[in-house]
């Protein structure tokens, strides 16, 4: 029987913890929350300890932290409407421009682009212009409501965003004029889309929502053998699977493991659930099964989950209950 084994419970933040992010090497992670601080944790022997506290970068709650692909930089998105860039435990740049809370931040695969999104309904794309310099390359106003999450495609410079307007949007740079355009709108959820994550090759996307469902989307490129029409020769995204009935409240985060293909969800019912694609799953109509559920993973809402990028089967979670938990999937 497959189950999640709790390996560590970590405390240190004051108040709710909003975000956790594994370092690309998988041997440390960053956390952020209501206390306006970022903590960097690493494993010492068999104990996870806070190595550094970064507390001078933001004036309000920090909503999300993300490491650059090289692992040298950390970006933090805050309710103070700024995004901070950290290097060697120092705040080296502060990105200003959003009118309201910054909800999410994401680095492109190359590390040359950074995306941010906000309650002001906009998505900003920043170019890394040199040492600690960032230039705004685009301001995208495609959403009609608060934008909750931005995530870059794992291999291409394609950006996905999730919003309070119930949609997901895809953005890419135009080959004609170098402008960033909205290339697709993914509509199927009936309430806020809280989070999204690509699979390993970026051909599929998982989304989670306030409507208590997970949805799997597939990319259909021009000339695809499924016969899906692609107007203007742009990639079309279709919802190919809806997972409902397993969550009783809003699903706040989702993580698609790049090594195992397992999907983890973080829910407002205090639970964490792991889904596996069925062995007889079809490409254009995939099926997933609930592999295991930790119904009381935390004492309050689970805000974030993320699979370790190096250690297969290791999962981290954080919650309104002020704890971070590290889990191991045991088969």
Curated annotation (Swiss-Prot):
Residue stretches of each WD repeat: 12-51, 57-96, 97-136, 142-181, 188-227, 246-285, 297-331
SUPFAM superfamilies membership: WD40 repeat-like
Keyword Iron-sulfur: no
Highest taxon in the source lineage: Eukaryota
Keywords from the UniProt entry: Repeat, WD repeat
Function in brief: Essential component of the cytosolic iron-sulfur (Fe/S) protein assembly machinery. Required for the maturation of extramitochondrial Fe/S proteins.
PANTHER family referenced in this protein's UniProt entry, alphabetically: CYTOSOLIC IRON-SULFUR PROTEIN ASSEMBLY PROTEIN CIAO1-RELATED, WD40 PROTEIN CIAO1
Protein name as annotated: Probable cytosolic iron-sulfur protein assembly protein Ciao1
């Amino acid at each position: 029987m497959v189950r999640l084994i709790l390996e560590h419970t970590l405390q240190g933040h004051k108040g709710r913890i909003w975000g956790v992010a594994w370092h690309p090497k998988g041997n440390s992670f960053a956390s952020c929350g209501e206390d306006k601080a970022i903590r960097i944790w690493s494993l010492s022997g068999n104990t996870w300890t806070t190595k550094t506290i970064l507390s001078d970068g933001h004036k309000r709650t920090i909503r999300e932290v993300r490491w650059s692909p090289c692992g040298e930089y950390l970006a933090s998105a805050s309710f103070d409407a700024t995004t901070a860039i950290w290097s060697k435990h120092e705040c080296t740049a502060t990105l200003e421009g959003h009118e309201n809370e910054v909800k999410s931040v994401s680095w492109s695969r190359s590390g040359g682009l950074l995306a941010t999104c906000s309650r002001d309904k906009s998505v900003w794309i920043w170019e890394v212009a040199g040492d600690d310099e960032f230039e705004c390359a685009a301001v995208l106003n495609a959403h009609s409501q608060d934008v909750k999450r931005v995530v870059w495609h794992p291999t291409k410079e394609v950006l996905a965003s999730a919003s309070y307007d119930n949609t997901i949007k895809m953005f890419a740079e135009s080959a004609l004029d170098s402008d960033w355009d909205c290339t697709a709108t993914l509509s199927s959820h009936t309430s806020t889309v809280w989070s999204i994550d690509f699979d390993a090759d970026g051909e599929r996307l998982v989304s989670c929502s306030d409507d208590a469902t997970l949805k799997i989307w597939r990319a259909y490129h021009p000339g695809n053998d499924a016969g899906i029409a692609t107007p203007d020769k742009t990639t079309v995204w279709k919802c190919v699977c809806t997972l409902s009935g397993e969550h009783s409240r809003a699903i706040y985060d989702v993580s698609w493991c790049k090594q195992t293909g397992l999907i983890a969800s973080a829910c407002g019912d205090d639970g964490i659930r792991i889904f596996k694609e069925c062995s007889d799953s079809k490409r254009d109509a995939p099926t997933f099964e609930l592999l295991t559920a930790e119904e009381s993973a935390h004492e309050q809402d689970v805000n974030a989950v993320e699979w370790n990028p190096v250690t297969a089967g290791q999962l981290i979670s954080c919650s309104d209950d002020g704890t971070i938990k590290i889990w191991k999937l045991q088969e």
